[in-house]
Amino acid sequence: MVKNKKILVGILMGSASDAETMVETEKILKENKIPYEINVLSAHRNPDAVRKYTKIAEKRGIKILICGAGMAAALAGVVSSHTSLPVIGVPIETKSLQGLDSLLSTVQMPGGVPVACMAIGKAGAKNAAIFAVRILKAFK
């Protein structure tokens, strides 16, 4: 994490085990000197904490939220439903369905709940950070 700077990107993970994938997001943000923070918040186990974090993110100066989650992968959609910030979803690869469950849960959002969905796994985590960097650079 880049220290002593205003956080621009919030990385959320549904489970601590998702860190193995989301480290790819961190690498790209670090390389580009983008200040970020990481939180483990499950849409299923901690819905109130997810809502609280999401609702104050914009007031704190965060510009983009990146959400990595596996299986039912509701995190990105739930986050998007509580903010007007751009939300990027990263489907985490799973053992049972190789991440197809996560992909479909992340990409199939109802109208009015936009989530930019990346590829499954580490490639998606990397692309999420690259996409965030491009968004931030476009508005400098």
Language model segments and positions:
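Basic/polar N-terminal segments that are highly enriched at the extreme N-terminus
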Residues: M1-K6
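Glycine-rich phosphate-binding loop
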Residues: Y53-I92
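N-terminal beta-loop-helix "entrance" segment that forms/cooperates
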Residues: I38-R60
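Glycine- and other small-residue-rich loops at beta-strand/loop junctions that grip anionic moieties
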Residues: N39-A43, G68-A69, I92, C117-G121
